[in-house]
UniProtKB/Swiss-Prot annotation:
<feature type="modified residue" description="N6-(pyridoxal phosphate)lysine">
    <location>
        <position position="218"/>
    </location>
</feature>
<dbReference type="InterPro" id="IPR001917">
    <property type="entry name" value="Aminotrans_II_pyridoxalP_BS"/>
</dbReference>
<dbReference type="GO" id="GO:0000105">
    <property type="term" value="P:L-histidine biosynthetic process"/>
</dbReference>
<dbReference type="InterPro" id="IPR015422">
    <property type="entry name" value="PyrdxlP-dep_Trfase_small"/>
</dbReference>
<dbReference type="Pfam" id="PF00155">
    <property type="entry name" value="Aminotran_1_2"/>
</dbReference>
<comment type="similarity">
    <text>Belongs to the class-II pyridoxal-phosphate-dependent aminotransferase family. Histidinol-phosphate aminotransferase subfamily.</text>
</comment>
<dbReference type="GO" id="GO:0030170">
    <property type="term" value="F:pyridoxal phosphate binding"/>
</dbReference>
<protein>
    <recommendedName>
        <fullName>Histidinol-phosphate aminotransferase</fullName>
        <ecNumber>2.6.1.9</ecNumber>
    </recommendedName>
</protein>
<keyword id="KW-0028">Amino-acid biosynthesis</keyword>
<dbReference type="InterPro" id="IPR005861">
    <property type="entry name" value="HisP_aminotrans"/>
</dbReference>
<keyword id="KW-0368">Histidine biosynthesis</keyword>
<comment type="pathway">
    <text>Amino-acid biosynthesis; L-histidine biosynthesis; L-histidine from 5-phospho-alpha-D-ribose 1-diphosphate: step 7/9.</text>
</comment>
<dbReference type="InterPro" id="IPR015421">
    <property type="entry name" value="PyrdxlP-dep_Trfase_major"/>
</dbReference>
<dbReference type="InterPro" id="IPR015424">
    <property type="entry name" value="PyrdxlP-dep_Trfase"/>
</dbReference>
<keyword id="KW-0663">Pyridoxal phosphate</keyword>
<comment type="subunit">
    <text>Homodimer.</text>
</comment>
<keyword id="KW-0032">Aminotransferase</keyword>
Length: 355
């Protein structure tokens, strides 16, 4: 081949880096991916696999995971026509972005936010309009409203509670954004179970331009099974479904979802623990010299230190893996870590006191 292979690829790839997790995904104390510290109990895993082995493995699952969508619709008390299940919420992000964006279309993204938003928008050769957070990492609501209007954006994506900042918009603030804009508004509620704010799910019938994204990877503790959902009014959902990859969700995912939701007290107990430990961690961080914690509305905390790179490496060398988020706007020398088990949290506190 005489031509450079790069000229045969999507030119947008030149502006995109491969997604990676600094420090890897293995550690004695792993606190870098905002996962639940609690695995699904073995008795429930055995019940799930007992059901799964009855399924035909040589046959494709349904084109769309109708069983899983019905189960989640019943759990939420909404119409199944308002529900779309995916192989993790990241796959659903790709689906929604494909349905809403394309070359030249404008997407508004508060900055910093989940990095995958910008990556998908760049792949689709869309124009990204960023709105910086305030210095305390809170959303700048007025700037979002003003920019959405002045730039006539086509799509707005808001992570609330937000990753990586841990801050949230209120129910009424999200409603105002969606009411005030002619754009599709995607609200990523990956961390909603940990939030002091209430979900905007009840607004999907009132606001025809609103889409709510959910994941089963955080509070529900199913990161390894890959389950996500989009929730919207049926007319909008029918359009979003058009680029959805067929057969993407496995029967195992549907069975797991059904049986975990049937034992939801496991989730509520875990969330109660995480919220309690989150406050204990925050209080402890306030007592450590050189550590500035930020109030969190998620299952993770953000702290600012004098040298995040050095602290990150020192923790990693001692078997504790956190996330260095210093590369994000306004987050210089910041580290992020999710709530772990009691002993893990205590070890993290002890190590930070040594620096």
């Amino acid at each position: 081949m005489k031509r450079d292979i790069q000229y045969l690829l999507n030119p947008a790839l030149q502006n995109i880096a491969t997604y990676r997790v600094e420090g890897g995904q293995q550690a004695e104390i792993k606190l870098n991916q905002n996962e639940s510290p609690f695995d699904v109990p073995m008795w429930l895993k055995e019940e799930i696999t007992g059901e799964f082995i009855k399924e035909p493995w040589n046959r494709y699952p349904d084109i769309l995971p109708y069983r899983g969508m019905q189960v989640y619709a019943d759990f939420l008390g909404i119409s199944p026509d308002s529900v779309m299940m995916s192989n993790g919420s990241n796959e659903m992000l790709y689906t929604i972005f494909l349905a809403c964006l394309g070359p030249g279309r404008k997407v508004l993204i508060p900055d910093p936010s989940f990095s995958l938003y910008e990556k998908i928008a760049l792949l689709l050769q869309s124009q990204i309009v960023t709105v910086p957070m305030l210095p305390d990492l809170d959303f700048d609501l007025e700037a979002i409203l003003r920019t959405a209007h002045d730039e006539a954006v086509d799509f707005i994506v808001i992570s609330t509670p937000n990753n990586p900042t841990g801050k949230s918009l209120t129910f009424e603030e999200v409603r105002l954004i969606a009411q005030s804009s002619d754009a599709i508004v995607l609200v990523d509620e990956a961390y909603i179970e940990f939030s002091r704010q209430r979900s905007v799910l009840e607004l999907i019938d009132e606001l025809p331009n609103l889409v709510v994204l959910r994941t089963m990877s955080k509070a529900i503790a199913l990161a390894g099974i890959r389950i996500g959902f989009a929730l919207a009014n049926p007319l909008l959902m029918a359009e979003i479904a058009k680029p959805k990859i067929p057969f993407a969700s496995s029967r195992l995912a549907e069975i797991t979802l059904s049986m975990v939701l049937a034992n939801y007290s496991l989730v509520t107990d875990a969330v109660s623990y995480i919220l309690h430990e989150r406050e204990k961690l925050y209080t402890a961080m306030l007592t450590i010299d050189g550590v500035e914690p930020f109030v969190s509305d998620t299952n993770f905390l953000i702290i600012r230190v004098s040298d995040a790179g050095s602290v990150f490496q020192n923790l990693q060398s001692q078997g504790i893996l956190v996330r260095n988020v210093s590369g994000y706007r306004l987050m210089e020398n910041c580290l992020r870590f999710n709530v772990g088990l009691v002993d893990e949290n205590q070890q993290l506190i002890a190590k930070l006191r040594q620096f």
